[in-house]
Amino acid sequence: MNRKIFGIITFGTFASVAVLCAAPVRAADAKTPYPSMAPLDQYLIADRNAEIALARTAAPLSISRDATVMVLGPHGYETAVAGKNDFVCMVERAWMNPFDSPEFWNPKNRSPICLNPPAARTVLPLTVMRTKLVLAGKSKEEVKESVKAAIEKKELPELEAGAMSYMMSKDAYLTDKGGHNMAHLMFYMPLGTVWGANVVDSSNEVSEPFPGSPLLLAPSYKGNPEPIDMFLMGTGVWSDGTAAPM
């Protein structure tokens, strides 16, 4: 695979700095646009029904209409709709990015996702824990160390075979870069799995050890601290069946 699949979320060109003496400050801001957590209300969606609807756009209706739906509250995720098919749909926030991502605290991030049953059982608990710690006011380093400790103590479930998720929402805002979005599937595998995937770093830059491969190895998890490799594959179609950029 080349950069075409991931090109929609690469950096755009920034305007030149008008005042020369301000350049160092602006450069620093560009590298760390979100240095700390924004006020909580910027991450919440006031209309609960709107968040439920957005969560369901992550997967085709045949999956999402019978899924459990979770929404973000002031203290963490809570179940808004009880499902029938053991899938779970929700809208993730930016703190599910790698800990060194410059967008870790981006309040604009809205990432609808539907997890299949194995992922709901063994990947979702990571999301729930990270979120609870963030909303309790923990720093990035404190969140990371708490998750690491929970893994070492086996307080979190081990990854189950067959875990995957859908991120096919046309209305997602995944990143500030490019088109902000990408319709894709995600496959969760044990750390160190080799699938011949090209590699995405925490700034969404792509290196290509396997040109032509349709797979990307995401920067999330990767032992930092979760012992999971997450592979992405573009779908070329949104959850509503319309064509998506590739």
Can you name each region flagged by the protein language model?
Residues 21-27:
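Sec/Tat signal peptide C-region and signal peptidase I cleavage site
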Residues 16-17:
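Sec-dependent, cleavable N-terminal signal peptides
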Residues 1-13:
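Bacterial N-terminal signal peptides that target proteins for export
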Residues 29-246:
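Primary mode marks residue(s) on the alpha4-beta5-alpha5 output face of response regulator receiver
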